[in-house]
């Protein structure tokens, strides 16, 4: 009954939005709908049985692999006992397909289903995940890979979906954060304050029990078979709730070719940075000889690591440690400053500037945008068909990976340093006490979430809406009442 009421309340608003925003017409022949099952998944982590979520197709295929130019036509079936919805992170979709409960749709009730249908306009590495409650912490997520039919394919593709795991329920973690029980934990730094001006950087709020790659720890890592001479495309997805990662591909030479699904001019290295919510595509070539090649990700501010192993057929598989030899520090802007988009925005002066102040208080665990806590917000309003500059000013001692739904944006400036042809993103990391400027075109009308992708920062209030002028707003009070 409750879900019927919610759907009824949303119907009028969503119909009006669609009339104004317009629905994108199919660009390719429709295919038979793919069925995506949201289900409970039991696994063993550090010797203990743990129940998580998983999104897979009836034949066991994890997530979704599509082709640019075709239709995404999927029926999501909720086989759990919790309401949910699925957001297609990084994809530019019609607003009513964005998968945000109470904003673009009612939640999918237990035993219910929802049909998503939209054209695939992009290619690259994306991911799908719940936007309901704290379900991302329990791995309600999956890869979403879109191939480009015109792109030269690698010999092999390997997905690494990185996650942070706790034996505690996410609701308990958040309650402890709200009551200050984790406030002094800080693996990597000092105490956060309201203004952040006189405090040392804070790297971690949550003490995790393990980091996982594709649901597995390094005690039992996935072994991927490769052959000498293979070109392997590593698709890294930071599907973690709160953990930024350093990527280490060891003895292999990597070439980063895409960030957030968007092509970049190649950057060669064997170490990369990957903030929460971002994706990174790295090419590696397997040398001659029989050998195993660990591909590792170490959590920012910790010695904990995760990963998998690439191995030739006769290679000896090494045993891997979950603890690195040393603790790593904080992510920085070095990598971002090097990234250059293959297809940057066409030069155009912004017609509007939006100031996005990021504030927070670690003791009360309240996180705000322009001093507003979700859902008690005044949306950032834009006008269709304009170039918009968005200025993120982080006034806290924590980094915030800021994600804008339904759009891609270009990084144009970091701490006063202009960047020509900066990388195109849907998620950008804004470091403590720093400023990042981005630009995007308002070419996708609707109401779009914009939030920190640190799960407990988002839950603590660091979320808002970008509203296109003339598009009716959903009833935001319902998001709070129904969530409570």
Descriptions of predicted regions:
Residues 1-9:
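Bacterial N-terminal signal peptides that target proteins for export
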Residues 8-18:
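Bacterial N-terminal signal peptides
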Residues 24-35, 39, 140-180, 264-397, ...:
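Extended terminal and domain-junction accessory segments
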Residues 42-68, 208-227, 359-387:
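N-terminal edge beta-strand
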Residues 50, 59-66, 72, 88-122, ...:
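Extracytoplasmic beta-sandwich strand-turn segments characteristic of Greek-key/jelly-roll folds
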Residues 76-80, 236-240, 392-396:
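Asparagine-centered strand-capping/turn motif at beta-strand->loop junctions
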Residues 112-161:
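Hydrophobic or amphipathic alpha-helical targeting/insertion segments
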Residues 159-230, 237:
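Acidic-aromatic/histidine active-site loop/patch
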């Amino acid at each position: 009954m409750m879900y019927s009421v919610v759907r009824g309340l949303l119907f009028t608003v969503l119909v009006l939005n669609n009339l104004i925003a317009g629905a994108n017409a199919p660009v390719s022949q429709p295919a038979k709908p793919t069925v995506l099952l949201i289900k409970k998944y039991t696994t063993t982590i550090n010797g203990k049985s743990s129940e998580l979520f998983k999104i897979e197709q009836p034949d066991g295929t994890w997530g979704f692999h599509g082709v640019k130019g075709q239709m995404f036509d999927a029926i999501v079936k909720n086989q759990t006992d919790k309401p949910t919805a699925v957001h297609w992170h990084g994809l530019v979709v019609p607003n009513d397909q964005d998968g945000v409960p109470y904003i673009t749709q009612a939640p999918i009730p237990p035993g219910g289903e929802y049909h998503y249908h939209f054209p695939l306009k992009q290619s690259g590495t994306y991911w799908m995940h719940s936007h309901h409650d704290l379900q991302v912490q329990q791995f309600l997520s999956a890869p979403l890979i879109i191939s480009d039919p015109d792109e030269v394919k690698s010999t092999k593709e390997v997905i690494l979906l990185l996650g942070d795991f706790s034996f505690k329920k996410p609701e308990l973690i958040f309650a402890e954060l709200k009551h200050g029980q984790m406030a002094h934990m800080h693996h990597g730094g000092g105490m956060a304050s309201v203004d952040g001006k006189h405090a040392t950087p804070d790297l971690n709020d949550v003490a995790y029990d393990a980091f996982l790659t594709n649901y597995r720890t390094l005690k039992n890592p996935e072994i991927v078979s490769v052959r000498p001479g293979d070109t392997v495309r590593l698709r890294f997805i930071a599907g973690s709730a709160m953990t930024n990662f350093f990527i280490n591909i060891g003895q292999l030479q990597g070439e980063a070719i895409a960030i957030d699904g968007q092509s970049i001019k190649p950057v060669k290295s064997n170490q990369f940075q990957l903030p929460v919510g971002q994706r990174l595509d790295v090419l590696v070539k397997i040398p001659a000889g029989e050998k195993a090649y660990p591909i590792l990700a170490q959590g920012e501010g910790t010695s904990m690591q995760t990963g998998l192993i690439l191995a030739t057929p006769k290679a000896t598989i090494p045993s891997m440690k979950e603890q690195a030899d040393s603790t790593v520090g904080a992510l920085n802007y070095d990598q971002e400053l090097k990234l250059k988009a293959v297809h940057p925005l066409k030069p155009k002066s912004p017609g509007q500037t939006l100031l996005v102040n990021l504030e927070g208080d670690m003791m009360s665990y309240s996180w705000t945008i322009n001093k507003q806590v979700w859902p008690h917000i005044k949306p950032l309003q834009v006008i269709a068909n304009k170039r918009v500059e968005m200025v993120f000013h982080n006034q806290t001692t924590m980094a915030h990976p800021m994600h804008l739904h339904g759009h891609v944006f270009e990084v144009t400036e970091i701490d006063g340093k202009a960047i020509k042809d900066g990388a195109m993103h849907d998620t950008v990391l804004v470091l403590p006490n720093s400023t990042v400027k981005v630009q995007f075109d308002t070419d996708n009308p609707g109401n779009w979430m914009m939030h920190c992708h640190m799960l407990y920062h988002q839950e603590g209030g660091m979320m808002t809406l970008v509203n296109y002028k003339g598009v009716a707003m959903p009833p935001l009070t319902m998001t709070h009442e129904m969530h409570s």
